[in-house]
């Protein structure tokens, strides 16, 4: 946590930035935009199938499959033009996933499910610009009070037909992104800070919370991924900033957005922004 100097406070008041109606992020002098952060992907080789699977031919909603668990498998997403499909498998209370891409079929220990059911999304795109398309999968792995977590997987097909998963690392949106967040306090105002951007979070704070006990902000347990495809654009990350203070878990006060890029086995978050929620 940092205290805003009187000069900055005066500047904000003179320019009208102190008004309660202000919703946009404010510019913080003497700072620079948050720099991109990167981390290596979590690499997993797809397993050869351990049994002969009778693959379903029709796509069903994940909720429908959950309601009729008498069926051990379900096709949850497909890309007909690329001859690719994503399957969920249940056996003896264990779950795993199958990815079929042309003549390739591999098992992965991917999670999916709820209690909030969010359907997996599947794309085929040359994400890293190497001239070869990859399968892109976003699957929902966690939900609950203050929790909404999705995973991002980029799968490459190797020359021998095997499939390799490059997963977006949790540490990038948890530890690394959290380290860029901060709070700034004036006499009666509290701001969330990301690079040169400020968001007034005074009204988002619990009534009985003393801002002085704030250690800062973290990203909590919110991570979502989406794309602009088939239009131009890339992969988007959306998260949240929550209080780092004893007794206030998952108390979210601002939203975070960024773009995701992938190349050479490394993921990068760039164009980071902080927004009022």
Regions found by a protein language model. Give the residues of each.
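Acidic carboxylate motifs that coordinate Ca2+ or other divalent cations, activating on Asp/Glu
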Residues: 130, 134
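Positively charged n-region of N-terminal signal peptides that target proteins for export
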Residues: 1-8
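C-terminal motif of bacterial Sec signal peptides marking the signal peptidase cleavage site
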Residues: 15-16
């Amino acid at each position: 946590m940092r205290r805003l100097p009187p000069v900055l406070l005066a500047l904000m008041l003179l320019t009208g930035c102190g008004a309660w109606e202000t919703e946009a992020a404010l510019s913080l002098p003497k700072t620079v935009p948050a720099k991109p952060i990167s981390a290596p992907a979590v690499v997993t080789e797809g397993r050869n199938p351990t049994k002969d699977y009778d693959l379903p031919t029709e796509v069903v909603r994940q909720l429908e499959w959950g309601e009729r668990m008498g069926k051990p498998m379900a096709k949850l997403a497909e890309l007909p033009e690329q001859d690719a499909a994503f399957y969920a498998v249940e056996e003896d209370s264990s779950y795993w996933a199958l990815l079929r891409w042309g003549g390739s079929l591999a098992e992965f220990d991917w999670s999916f499910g709820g209690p909030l059911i969010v359907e997996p999304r599947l794309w085929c795109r040359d994400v890293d610009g190497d001239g070869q398309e990859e399968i892109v999968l976003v699957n929902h792995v966690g939900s609950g009070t203050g929790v909404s977590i999705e995973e991002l997987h980029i799968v490459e097909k190797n020359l021998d037909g095997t499939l390799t998963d490059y997963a977006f690392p949790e540490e990038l949106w948890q530890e690394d992104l959290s380290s860029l967040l901060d709070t700034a306090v004036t006499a009666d105002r509290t701001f969330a800070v990301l690079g040169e951007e400020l968001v007034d979070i005074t009204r988002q704070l619990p009534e009985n919370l003393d801002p002085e006990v704030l250690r800062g902000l973290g990203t909590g347990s919110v991570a979502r991924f989406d794309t602009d495809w088939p239009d131009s654009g890339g992969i988007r990350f959306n998260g949240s900033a929550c209080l780092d203070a004893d007794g206030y878990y998952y108390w979210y006060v601002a939203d975070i957005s960024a773009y995701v890029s992938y190349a050479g086995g490394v993921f990068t978050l760039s164009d980071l922004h902080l927004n009022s929620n």
